Amino acid sequence: MAKQEYKQLPKRAEVHSATEQFKDTIKTSLGLDLFKGLGLTIKEFFSPSVTIHYPMEQLPLSPRYRAVHHLQRLLDSGSERCIGCGLCEKICTSNCIRIITHKGEDNRKKIDSYTINLGRCIYCGLCAEVCPELAIVMGNRFENASTQRSQYGSKSEFLTNEQDAKNCSHAEFLGFGAVSPNYNERMQATPLDYVQEPSKEESKEETPTNPESNKGDENV
């Protein structure tokens, strides 16, 4: 291993007299480093601002931003989209979703309780991806501070207002977990049950290569 050579700096001369102390103060205060720092400060002072006055001003968020969950209702009818299948509870990696259901008179699951522990949630979005009815989606509300713990995870905080859904005062959700824009042509039963689009090779095989030969066959 190579031997390291250390360079010893000369010791600073001790200042005793008042004149020497005054000279040392002037040299330290009015040195070149001080003017460099002041020049940088003045330059940044007159440069355009890159910050905003939060919370009076807020930057726009991406529609696929993953923040506090949002439970949706069906438009026009106002009924809850959730069917109580429990897929979101099963796929949750942080075990923060809890659903309690019972079977109703029509042999359909009825939801007794639906809670999300926001203190454990990691906002991965798996619950929104696996939901077959687009009942739970990831919203853009990231300001969820509260003084009471009971307000974290109650269903009423996540669920869409019934009157807003009936009046169609908001558009269909297009953020994280939403279906593709052409879902009307591809959807069969549920939002995640799509018709597979034909590949390029299959479309080429279906397209006739020589239309004139086909016409001759039809005439025969």
Curated annotation (Swiss-Prot):
Residues 71-102, 112-141 form the 4Fe-4S ferredoxin-type domain. Binds 2 [4Fe-4S] clusters per subunit. Residues 198-207 have a biased composition (Basic and acidic residues). Belongs to the complex I 23 kDa subunit family. PANTHER family: NADH DEHYDROGENASE [UBIQUINONE] IRON-SULFUR PROTEIN 8, MITOCHONDRIAL (PTHR10849:SF20), NADH DEHYDROGENASE UBIQUINONE IRON-SULFUR PROTEIN 8, MITOCHONDRIAL (PTHR10849). Its main location: membrane. It is a peripheral membrane protein. InterPro entries: 4Fe4S_Fe-S-bd, 4Fe4S_Fe_S_CS, NADH_quinone_OxRdtase_chainI. It is an enzyme of class 7 (translocase). It holds the Pfam family Fer4_7. The keyword Iron applies. The keyword Methyltransferase does not apply. The lineage of its organism: Bacteria, Pseudomonadati, Campylobacterota, Epsilonproteobacteria, Campylobacterales. Residues 187-220 are annotated as: Disordered. It catalyses: a quinone + NADH + 5 H(+)(in) = a quinol + NAD(+) + 4 H(+)(out). NDH-1 is composed of 14 different subunits. Subunits NuoA, H, J, K, L, M, N constitute the membrane sector of the complex. It is found in: Cell inner membrane. This is NADH-quinone oxidoreductase subunit I. [4Fe-4S] cluster 1 binds at C82, C85, C88, C131. GO terms for cellular component: plasma membrane. NDH-1 shuttles electrons from NADH, via FMN and iron-sulfur (Fe-S) centers, to quinones in the respiratory chain. The immediate electron acceptor for the enzyme in this species is believed to be ubiquinone. Couples the redox reaction to proton translocation (for every two electrons transferred, four hydrogen ions are translocated across the cytoplasmic membrane), and thus conserves the redox energy in a proton gradient. [4Fe-4S] cluster 2 binds at C92, C121, C124, C127. Its cofactor is [4Fe-4S] cluster.
